[in-house]
């Protein structure tokens, strides 16, 4: 599961404080920009190709957004691209601090989009599209300037759920993550009202679901009519009522009925996670949201994991023998070395002797690999000269750690020698890599990637990076071998001594655990969860499996026994997955059409992608701070 995407754009609502929220300017950026018909894309350093990718995605997204809103852009939008989240946190375009999890921001005074590239093209494309929806709504409803709204001259205030929900709906439509969140709400009978969506993180996934219902019942053409009516009446609810014929109270009832019909029939087809695994954390008692990134100790008696029980992301040890929390090793967000614990792309890993745990952390201006003593909490750190470091995994024999590193426009699989601190790039291409795990003898690394069957460093705009397969780096031949080749998402691999590979996949629309006998064609489901599973780890015996499971609006940890012997014959598809290839066409109702409505792709031959445009590099005028309202 692409966990980073689920909470990508709203996690800033969860954590009230972060260490060092006053911005520190570590770097001076020499900005350049490229020009396309509707965008000026600003970049720096060696990120010209990333800027071109951004411009192409933005132009493609703008046409889709305009078609839905029945609106056409008449002024260029500025997009400022940072090559890492660490650089993004230094921006002066908006004054707010950008903690881990804020994937992009739209500044509404000058209608500028600010986004970081964090190694995943899927995430990056989603954020471009999502933030552009905000910029388009701002231009359409407020003339591209929110001053009228703030001064009171404009009365219309678009509800958070209507704004963020549409941004999610248009940028992702519907996927396994959204389905998981909404399915859980329906099954647990915790569906909010339309108005209640404004006061929680459900404004994103819940709002998406409302638009999904509206377009299924009334057609996609209604989206543009809703916003046209909002603008005409200067009232959000009247906009919906005039377009749909129902007020928010009736819309809530209709939406709830739709979801109950959709999901309640699934209850007898699938299992609750507690039906096949033992829960070792309990969010209902600790009142937190995240318990993630579990990792077995070498003896299998302790599980290390990240948790936000105290409002910060901490590293905690849990004893399986006593069933209780043993100790809190690291308190995140409270010191310069633990500014952020990379909980969106986590990876905890024990040393072979069980004396240390490794993880990645933001430490000042750069990321580091931290190795903390499990007995006394002392730690060492190795600064890594990359744009981002994620998901560490300790070599089973040697003093080395594999990790995912992000540099410029790519994320790759790396190894660092802990004795010499030499860093080696193993994959070294443009594709995005994730979730490495070692084989028992250290001769192979299995990982997840969006590379498919492609090789080299192609133009990523023309690559289908929408899903991940599993791959293996074989040190004997120094080559990458593909393990899975499906149109689905495989992730979080974990290998046993017996050459069994466990991983998660959404083959049926729900993220479940699968088992694969390496070297064979046997792939077997071992769970049939009703919600979703991620971030798995198998103990040294290969018998116990720990994972993070989603239920009751959050993530808990579970341990499953006899993982080698479990098997499910059939796991039925969800409705959205069975209909995922259906094409939902609708009429383009914009008044002016300068392009063929059924064009398959955009012609970029007339675009100006010039390296000679510079934006006053010494003054950085476009990086001057405004006390501006923002939309995430």
Please report, for each region that a protein language model flagged, where it lies by residue:
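Blade-terminus and WD-like Trp-Asp/Gly-His loop motifs, strongest in beta-propeller folds
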Residues: 294-302, 348-356, 392-400, 436-444, ...
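Outer-membrane beta-barrel initiation region
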Residues: 568-632
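A flexible loop/linker signature enriched in serine peptidases of the S9 family
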Residues: 180, 287-289, 306-316, 333-343, ...
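Sec-dependent N-terminal signal peptides
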Residues: 3-13
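Beta/coil-rich, acidic/histidine-enriched accessory regions frequently appended to metallopeptidases
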Residues: 22-25, 31-33, 228, 232-339, ...
């Amino acid at each position: 599961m692409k966990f980073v995407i689920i909470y990508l754009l709203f996690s800033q609502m969860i954590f009230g404080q972060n260490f060092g929220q006053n911005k520190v300017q570590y770097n001076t950026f020499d900005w350049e920009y490229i020009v396309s018909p509707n965008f000026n894309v600003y970049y720096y350093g060696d990120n010209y190709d990333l800027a071109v990718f951004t411009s192409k995605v933005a132009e493609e997204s703008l046409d889709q957004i305009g078609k839905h809103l029945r609106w056409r852009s008449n002024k260029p939008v500025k997009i400022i691209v940072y090559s890492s989240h660490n650089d993004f946190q230094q921006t002066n375009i908006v004054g707010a601090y950008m903690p881990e999890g804020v994937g992009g921001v739209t500044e509404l005074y000058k209608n500028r989009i600010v986004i970081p590239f964090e190694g995943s093209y899927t995430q990056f494309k989603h954020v471009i599209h999502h933030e552009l929806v905000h910029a388009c709504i701002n231009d359409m409803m407020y003339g591209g300037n929110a001053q009228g709204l703030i001064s009171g001259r404009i009365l219309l205030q678009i509800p958070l759920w209507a704004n963020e929900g549409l941004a999610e709906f248009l940028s992702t439509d519907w996927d396994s993550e959204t389905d998981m969140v909404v399915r859980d709400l329906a099954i647990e009978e915790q569906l909010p009202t339309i108005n209640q969506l404004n006061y929680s993180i459900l404004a994103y996934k819940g709002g998406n679901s409302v638009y999904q219902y509206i377009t299924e019942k009334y057609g996609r053409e209604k989206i543009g009519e809703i916003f046209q009516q909002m603008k005409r009446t200067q009232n959000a609810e009247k906009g919906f009522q005039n377009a749909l014929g129902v007020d928010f109270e009736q819309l809530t009832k209709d939406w709830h009925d739709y979801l109950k019909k959709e999901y309640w029939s699934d209850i007898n087809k699938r299992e609750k996670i507690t039906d096949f695994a033992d829960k070792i954390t309990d969010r209902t008692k600790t009142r937190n949201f995240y318990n993630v990134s579990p990792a077995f100790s070498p003896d299998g008696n302790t599980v290390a994991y990240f948790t936000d029980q105290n409002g910060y992301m901490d590293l905690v040890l849990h004893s399986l023998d006593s069933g209780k929390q043993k100790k809190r090793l690291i308190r995140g967000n409270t010191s310069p070395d633990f500014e952020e614990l990379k909980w969106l792309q986590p990876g905890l890993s024990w040393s072979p002797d069980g004396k240390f745990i490794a993880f990645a952390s933001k430490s000042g201006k750069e990321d580091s690999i931290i190795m903390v003593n499990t007995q006394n909490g002392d730690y060492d750190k190795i600064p890594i000269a990359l744009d981002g470091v994620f998901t560490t995994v300790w070599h089973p024999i040697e003093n080395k750690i594999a990790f995912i590193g992000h540099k410029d426009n790519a994320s790759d699989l790396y190894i660092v020698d802990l004795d010499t601190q030499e860093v080696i790039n193993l994959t070294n291409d443009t594709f995005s890599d994730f979730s490495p795990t070692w084989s028992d003898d250290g001769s192979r690394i299995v990982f997840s990637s969006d590379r498919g069957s492609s090789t080299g460093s192609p133009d990523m705009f023309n690559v289908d990076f929408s899903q991940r397969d599993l791959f293996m780096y074989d040190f004997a031949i120094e080559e990458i071998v593909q393990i899975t080749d499906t149109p689905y998402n495989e992730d979080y691999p974990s290998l046993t001594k017996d050459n069994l590979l466990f991983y998660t996949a959404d083959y049926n629309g729900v993220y479940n655990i699968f088992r694969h006998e390496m070297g064979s064609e046997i792939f077997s489901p071992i769970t049939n969860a009703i919600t979703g599973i991620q971030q798995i780890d198998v103990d040294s015996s290969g018998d116990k499996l720990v994972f993070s499971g989603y239920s009751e609006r959050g993530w808990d940890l579970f341990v499953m026994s006899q993982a080698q012997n479990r098997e499910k014959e059939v796991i039925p598809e969800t409705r959205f997955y069975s209909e995922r290839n259906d094409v939902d066409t609708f009429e383009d109702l914009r008044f002016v059409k300068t392009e063929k409505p059924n064009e398959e792709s955009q012609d970029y031959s007339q675009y100006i992608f010039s390296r000679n445009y510079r934006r006053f590099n010494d003054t950085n005028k476009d990086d001057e701070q405004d006390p501006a309202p923002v939309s995430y």
